[in-house]
UniProtKB/Swiss-Prot annotation:
InterPro entries with a match to the protein in the record: Haem_peroxidase, Haem_peroxidase_sf, Peroxidase_pln, Peroxidases_AS, Peroxidases_heam-ligand_BS, Secretory_peroxidase
Active site: H84 (proton acceptor)
Gene: PER12
Alphabetical list of Pfam families matching this protein: peroxidase
Protein name according to UniProt: Peroxidase 12
Induction cue: Induced either by incompatible fungal pathogen attack, or by methyl jasmonate, a plant defense-related signaling molecule.
Organism of origin: Arabidopsis thaliana
Enzyme class: oxidoreductase
Highest taxon above the source species: Eukaryota
Length: 358
């Protein structure tokens, strides 16, 4: 019997034994219906653009189908940008802003250096398509929230309604603020639980949102602390050996898929990875190690629909964190710059040219 076969058999036996347990921890309902039952903050609504831009969701999904057909990896990249936006200042598209004379933008902060630049281009292209059809009425923050949802759906995950009506921020966070608000991959379960609780996200939300790692890639330095100088004892040895081949040194520039079983499919295999001690980050694997979150991991591993149901609820909750609504903020014409910046840039260039002629 080969080692790989033994691992598969062990996985199967674990899942079978867990399926024999009666699970009353979570109720299961249809994800789309459940999402509509989620509470929404004042200023957002399920049909915000019904009159101003009724086809906005169709425009975005149609374009993303083309984009992901060329590069499915962009689905995970867009989803990650949405997470990184919401966890810093709230879901107001500040992560999309490029740096300015006031300083570097959020994209220059260490946790955001590995965000794919092409994904930002995709968001701006969506902005242009929507604006061409409807005018400047749909915010970049709403476009990003819808694009994140469609990244999940078009990768095989659940469809869900997205409350709309967000406005775009007028400023980006400092690099320090950005760094301090994004949970690092070396956080353990206790640190994650506390961090999420500060955002009114509970333990189930934490485990469900972590399931976003079922797609995408990670750069070696984000997890090699578990390999060098000493190997994390919670890591499967065969998995560790594979990672060491991918990342021969702690600072290797190589990348590794987050989910070794189905890296480009949004499913529940991420939780199966954790049960087999094949989670990539400490923040992943410790969800199975810690008794407070282990049961949720096990439940999601054996019931994909259960995971989908709770993921959609958690995404809707996260997508409403510290949103701007009404007359707050603005609706950007270009997602990477404030509306006034285009004019100011021209003015500054004119002043510089005039000074050079003196």
């Amino acid at each position: 019997m080969t080692k790989a076969y033994s691992t598969r058999v062990l996985t199967f036996l674990i899942l079978i034994s867990l399926m024999a347990v009666t699970l009353n921890l979570f109720p299961t309902v249809e994800a789309k219906k459940r999402s509509r039952d989620a509470p929404i903050v004042k200023g957002l609504s399920w049909n915000f653009y019904q009159k101003a831009c009724p086809k906005v969701e169709n425009i975005i999904r149609k374009e993303l189908k083309k984009v992901f057909k060329r590069d499915i990896g962009l689905a995970a990249a867009i989803l990650r940008i949405h997470f990184h936006d919401c966890f810093v200042q709230g879901c107001e598209a500040s992560v999309l802003l490029a740096g300015s004379a006031s300083g570097p933008g959020e994209q220059s902060s260490i946790p955001n250096l590995t965000l794919r630049q092409q994904a930002f281009v995709v968001i701006n292209n969506l902005r242009a398509l929507v604006q061409k059809k409807c005018g400047q009425v749909v915010s970049c923050s709403d476009i990003l929230a819808l694009a994140a949802r469609d990244s999940v759906v078009l990768s095989g995950g659940p469809d869900y309604a997205v409350p709309l009506g967000r406005r775009d921020s007028l400023a980006f966070a400092s690099q320090e603020t950005t760094l301090n608000n994004l949970p690092p991959p070396f956080f353990n379960a206790s640190q994650l639980i506390a961090d999420f609780a500060n955002r009114n996200l509970n333990i189930t939300d934490l485990v469900a949102l972590s399931g976003g790692h079922t797609i995408g890639i990670a750069h070696c330095p984000s997890f090699t602390d578990r390999l060098y100088p000493n190997q994390d004892p919670t890591m499967n040895q065969f998995f560790a050996n594979s990672l060491k081949r991918t990342c021969p040194t702690a600072n290797s520039s190589n990348t590794q898929v987050n989910d070794i079983r189905s890296p480009d499919v949004f499913d529940n295999k991420y939780y199966v990875d954790l049960m087999n001690r094949q989670g990539l980050f400490t923040s992943d694997q410790d969800l199975f190690v810690d008794k407070r979150t282990r049961g949720i991991v096990e439940s999601f591993a054996i019931d994909q629909q259960l995971f989908f149901d709770y993921f959609t609820v958690a995404m809707i909750k996260m997508g409403q964190m510290s949103v701007l609504t009404g007359t707050q903020g603005e609706i950007r014409s270009n997602c990477s710059a404030r509306n006034t910046q285009s004019f100011m840039s021209v003015l500054e260039e004119g002043i510089e040219e005039a000074i050079s002629m003196i």
